[in-house]
Amino acid sequence: MRVLAAMSGGVDSAVAAARAVEAGHEVVGVHLALSAKPGTLRTGARGCCTIEDSHDARRAADILGIPFYVWDFAERFTEEVIETFVGEYAAGRTPNPCLTCNEKIKFEALLEKAMALGFDAVCTGHYARLTVEDGVPVLRRSRDEGKDQSYVLASLTAEQLGHSMFPLGDSLKSQVRQEAAERGLAVAKKPDSHDICFIPDGDTKKFLESKLGQKPGQLVDAETGAVLGEHTGVHGFTVGQRKGLGIDAPAPDGRPRYVLSLEPVSGTVKVGSADHLGVTEIDAKRPIWPSQRELDGPTECVVQVRAHGGTADAVAEVADGGMSIRLRRPLRGVAPGQAVVLYRPEEEGDLVLGSALIAATR
């Protein structure tokens, strides 16, 4: 097959490309330039998609003996990922930009261009597994549960999965680093990228304020209605947040306060004790079924509401064009705007049943 290997400049995508070459595919490497000012993104080990990363990807491609190109996706990344991220926070929701990037950039824009150029598949360094059931590709958790990325891939369609390759799905991260060293890849010891790539200093509040400005509002006690303080914008908060609330007076019972809800129109941020954070019901919208199989009535499953952690047994069913999910135990810090992913536990790796965006919780 003709395979386009997306090479970020990290160890995972380099080894994934190497395995595609070793499997006998005709492989071409590509690095996506996602910023109009890539030289300003790096701060220490944070960030990604910088000029330095582009050079690392090119060096890896040279060692593998494959052609290498840099494609400019900065404008589309800004429109599809950054502007969506800012808009969601302005609306009081908590988006996952990595999920949006996979859906709109790596497996929509990139895959479209790859298909137009005659490639059969796109290969990435994601930790996830693909198998085939009844002729349909299905997405599963990776062998390395600590590195599993099926959550941020769960919005892909069956058609997109059918043109995708995840060569690292059955490997542990330690094995990937060892293999990179054995192949002579300089990125073998390169630190993993963390945080949001377009906010390299990790200060999401400052970034959002630079885009949205200050929109003052009140911090209100959810139980008493008492005004506890003021803030500069609901975009500086997320449900479940404890630190950085800017409340000087301690709670009467001495317990920590958490963000319970955000009201973007009035600018009110309601806070309270952890007792009020537990969620047992989720209403979700825009469901996606990667295996093309919509739920048939109430379905036992495991749900995940964050990229790492936040899982619970649940019963989910299709309702009013979306999903209605009842959790077997309460989950904390479940915020509108997050993705909820449904899994079916299986020995060969938990299977992704579907995903949707959280609209409301109770």
Swiss-Prot record:
ATP binds at A6, M7, S8, G9, G10, V11, D12, S13, L32, G125. Gene3D superfamilies: Adenine nucleotide alpha hydrolases-like domains, HUPs, Translation factors. GO terms for molecular function: ATP binding; tRNA binding; tRNA-uridine 2-sulfurtransferase activity. Its main location: cytoplasm. Disulfide bonds join C101-C197. Pfam families: tRNA_Me_trans (PF03054), tRNA_Me_trans_C (PF20258), tRNA_Me_trans_M (PF20259). It catalyses: S-sulfanyl-L-cysteinyl-[protein] + uridine(34) in tRNA + AH2 + ATP = 2-thiouridine(34) in tRNA + L-cysteinyl-[protein] + A + AMP + diphosphate + H(+). InterPro entries: MnmA-like (IPR004506), MnmA-like_C (IPR046885), MnmA-like_central (IPR046884), MnmA-like_central_sf (IPR023382), Rossmann-like_a/b/a_fold (IPR014729). Its EC number is 2.8.1.13. Catalyzes the 2-thiolation of uridine at the wobble position (U34) of tRNA, leading to the formation of s(2)U34. NCBIfam families: PRK00143.1 (NF001138), trmU (TIGR00420). This is tRNA-specific 2-thiouridylase MnmA. It comes from Saccharopolyspora erythraea (strain ATCC 11635 / DSM 40517 / JCM 4748 / NBRC 13426 / NCIMB 8594 / NRRL 2338).
